[in-house]
Design a protein with these regions (language model features):
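The feature captures the beta-strand-to-loop junction immediately N-terminal to the Walker
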Residues: 34-36
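Helix-to-loop junction immediately C-terminal to a conserved catalytic motif
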Residues: 49
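Conserved ABC ATPase "signature" region
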Residues: 98, 111-129, 154
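Conserved ABC ATPase signature
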Residues: 133-137, 141
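Catalytic Walker B motif of ABC-type/P-loop ATPase nucleotide-binding domains
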Residues: 158-162
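ABC ATPase nucleotide-binding domains
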Residues: 233-256
Length: 256
């Protein structure tokens, strides 16, 4: 599946957020979006998912304008997991995750739907929480359950806004590796906003680095994760070492 952004711009009254964002990605691959706070990363994800309508430009999926796609078709094609969602439904974890099957089941869950949910819960390492109350989970458990809900939707394109927020280092690595593996298994295109440069470098197939509402650099980790790019975009000193063929960032004290 191909995802294109053609000259996408978005503005709030008196403030331009996105400016001429253009890219093309085809699955299966994991794409990481990097950049400081406030550069338009979440706004870009919202434009892709039609939460926001671009002020200019188009978002295309397999050469079709997303604005021309019916809502149910979009729901089957694109999944979205927001940043640190505050959803706290008074229901079991398994029932909360089952909501992700709605585009396929029309609210009538089948045995297949339940089996898909339990499989993802197991792979996320939270199958033991299936009968727990969703609104009683810790922040990290809640984040994993929200990711599970996005994954059981079985979208062709999965959009993730900081999917490892609220997770400790071990689970950040585990979840990102699982996302990469599922992306390949399911032949998905996964696009995730990430603030950890080294996790993005380690697991992403392609990286977008944003600055001032547009794409500053794009390509492989080797192309994007460079000292010059990081110092320009983040205004911090760093050095880069090789970590098994991937760049690894070591931050240094002080700003430029």
């Amino acid at each position: 599946m191909k995802l294109e952004s053609n000259g996408v711009a978005f503005s709030y009254p008196g403030r331009d957020v996105l400016k001429d964002v253009t890219f093309t990605f085809e699955g299966p691959q994991l794409v990481a979006i990097l950049g400081p706070n406030g550069v338009g990363k979440s706004t870009l994800i919202h434009c892709i998912d039609r939460i926001l309508r671009p002020t200019k430009g188009t978002v295309m999926i397999d050469d079709r304008d997303t604005m021309d796609m019916k809502m149910k078709e979009m729901a089957k094609t694109v999944g979205y997991v927001p940043y640190a969602s505050s959803d706290t439904f008074p229901m079991s974890v398994v029932d909360a995750v089952l909501l992700g099957r709605h585009p396929h089941s029309n609210w009538r869950s089948t045995r297949k739907d339940v089996a898909i949910v339990y499989d993802i819960l197991k792979r996320m390492g939270i199958d033991d929480l299936a009968k727990c109350q969703f609104n009683e989970l810790s922040a990290g458990q809640h984040q994993k359950a929200m990711l599970a809900r996005g994954l059981v939707q079985e979208p062709k394109i999965l959009l993730l806004d900081e999917p490892t927020a609220n997770l400790d280092v071990k689970h950040q690595l585990g979840v990102t590796k699982l996302l990469r593996d599922l992306t390949r298994e399911r032949k998905m295109l996964t696009v995730m906003i990430c603030h950890d440069l080294n996790i993005a470098s380690k697991y992403a197939d392609s990286i977008i680095m944003m600055k001032d509402g547009t794409i500053f650099a794009a390509g492989s980790a080797e192309d994007v994760i460079t000292r010059e790019n990081i110092e320009t975009v983040y205004d911090v000193k760093c050095r880069i070492i090789d970590d098994g063929g991937r760049p690894h960032v070591i931050l240094q004290d002080g700003t430029l």
